[in-house]
Swiss-Prot record:
Localization in the cell: Plastid, Chloroplast
Species of origin: Asarum canadense (Wild ginger)
Recorded name of the encoding gene: rbcL
Name the record gives this protein: Ribulose bisphosphate carboxylase large chain
Purpose of the protein: RuBisCO catalyzes two reactions: the carboxylation of D-ribulose 1,5-bisphosphate, the primary event in carbon dioxide fixation, as well as the oxidative fragmentation of the pentose substrate in the photorespiration process. Both reactions occur simultaneously and in competition at the same active site.
UniProt catalytic activity: 2 (2R)-3-phosphoglycerate + 2 H(+) = D-ribulose 1,5-bisphosphate + CO2 + H2O; D-ribulose 1,5-bisphosphate + O2 = 2-phosphoglycolate + (2R)-3-phosphoglycerate + 2 H(+)
N6,N6,N6-trimethyllysine PTM positions: K5
Chain sites annotated for binding Mg(2+): K192, D194, E195
UniProt modified residues of type N6-carboxylysine: K192
């Protein structure tokens, strides 16, 4: 072959292109790279670009049958990480044609499928992705989005309230449905299947769906509000998952649920399409996320998983709590909360946002705060997350000394008090405890909740730590 020279080659000759001007259609990635000792950062960055696009370890003669320049990933910028020795941020640009339209699965297979086991790297973390409108427009995205959800539920101007039914495993379907009814009758908008409630011997999915639907209809009739229970449709096969979603639709309930990481992006996208076609809202749980995102120097940051979910489709997704954690993490969390909700998000490194992201018309996702929160956190949660969020109190509802319904009442009263105080111009960050105390004077349910949880106000680590 003309110009074909066999042998192993330096990646950086082909894949490190510091002069490259990124295109509006490129998918851009920011990797945190920790090279092995003796490997220069340019070579490591180029290796990442190569292995996640067209490269292989040696020159192959079939390279001559295509235009590598058109299809290769390019490492176009490298910067050291402040305060970390031998860590670098490598920026890689991928041409759009490397990816199948409308497939988060293919996007991840390409970008993170192979390169993380690469020998020249000690560790590698995908910190952020810039999804160009040319690509995001090939996705349906969330089945409904924030505004349509509010219109379907007829609930405006406040966060929504939820509760995970506990104990998560072992209840019989009828008792489960009863706990569900008590919570939504007391004032919550939603109750939730735990992520590992699928269809176990002690409670098969169909029984649970029936009793929860009964709870929803009874509570709706008594309160005049629209209620829901996140019926977990996650299953062992895609076909079984869709079967469960179909049954939920036949019962006329408003929302189903999916574990998108354990279930997989292909299953999740199928379910999201079904939900849009059939008017079901879709609640997403992120079970398994910490396996991928917890290590600071290896894996994938949750903001990337959140962007992927917005493309694949979901109306709610769990996003940590912020409360009782460090200030810095608060900014990072709010960064990906904005990436979930807003149409246009400016690059802001202090919030971990490496690229300006323009979602154009892709609907937004409601962030869900859950994990170790209770009534004393309500002012902080209202302040931090704003109206477009779901606040979920599992133990913070079911752990009420007077039981489930009063627990739900306490949470609803606390929320309404915080929203009213905020609307009157009071500063929840400063006066939050006072707002809760005032409300508890006329709500015995809230007073009892305040009493039982006063010891642990703000002094614990949230269970949902990133």
């Amino acid at each position: 072959g003309v110009g074909f020279k066999a042998g192993v080659k330096d990646y950086k000759l082909t894949y490190y292109t510091p002069d490259y001007e990124t295109l509006a259609t490129d998918i851009l990635a920011a990797f945190r790279v920790x090279p092995q000792p003796g490997v220069p950062p340019e070579e490591a960055g180029a290796a990442v670009a190569a292995e996640s696009s067209t490269g292989t370890w040696t020159t192959v003669w079939t390279d001559g049958l295509t235009s590598l320049d058109r299809y290769k990933g390019r490492c176009y910028h490298i910067e050291p990480v402040a305060g970390e020795e031998s860590q670098f941020i490598a920026y890689v640009a991928y041409p759009l044609d490397l990816f199948e339209e409308g497939s988060v699965t293919n996007m991840f297979t390409s970008i993170v499928g192979n390169v993380f086991g690469f020998k020249a790297l000690r560790a590698l973390r995908l910190e952020d992705l810039r999804i160009p409108p040319a690509y995001s427009k090939t996705f349906q995205g969330p089945p409904h989005g924030i505004q349509v959800e509010r219109d379907k539920l007829n609930k405006y101007g406040r966060p929504l309230l939820g509760c995970t039914i506990k104990p998560k495993l072992g209840l019989l379907a009828k008792n489960y449905g009863r706990a569900d009814y008590e919570c939504i009758r007391g004032g919550l908008d939603f109750t939730k299947d735990d992520e590992n409630v699928n269809s176990q011997p002690f409670m098969r999915w169909r029984d649970r769906f029936l009793f929860c639907a009964e709870a929803i209809y009874k509570a709706q009739a008594e309160t005049g509000e629209i209620k829901g229970h996140y019926l977990n449709a996650t299953a062992g096969t895609c076909e079984e998952m869709i079967k469960r979603a179909v049954f939920a639709r036949e019962l006329g309930v408003p929302i189903v649920m999916h574990d998108y990481l354990t279930g997989g992006f292909t299953a999740n996208t199928s379910l999201a399409h079904y939900c849009r076609d059939n008017g079901l809202l879709l609640h997403i749980h992120r079970a398994m996320h910490a396996v991928i995102d917890r290590q600071k120097n290896h894996g994938i940051h949750f903001r990337v998983l959140a962007k992927a979910l917005r493309m694949s489709g979901g109306d709610h997704i769990h996003a940590g709590t912020v409360v009782g954690k460090l200030e810095g993490e608060r900014e990072i969390t709010l960064g990906f909360v904005d990436l979930l909700r807003d149409d246009f998000i400016e690059k802001d490194r202090s919030r971990g946002i490496y690229f300006t992201q323009d979602w154009v018309s892709l609907p937004g996702v409601l962030p869900v705060a859950s994990g170790g929160i209770h009534v004393w956190h309500m002012p902080a949660l209202t302040e931090i997350f704003g109206d477009d969020s779901v606040l979920q109190f599992g133990g913070g509802t079911l752990g009420h000394p007077w039981x489930n319904a009063p627990g739900a009442v306490a949470n609803r009263v606390a929320l309404e008090a915080c929203v009213q105080a905020r609307n009157e111009g009071r500063d929840l960050a400063r006066e939050g405890n006072e707002v809760i105390r005032e409300a508890s004077k006329w709500s015995p349910e809230l007073a009892a909740a305040c009493e039982i949880w006063k010891e642990i106000i703000f002094e614990f680590e949230a269970m949902d730590a990133l």
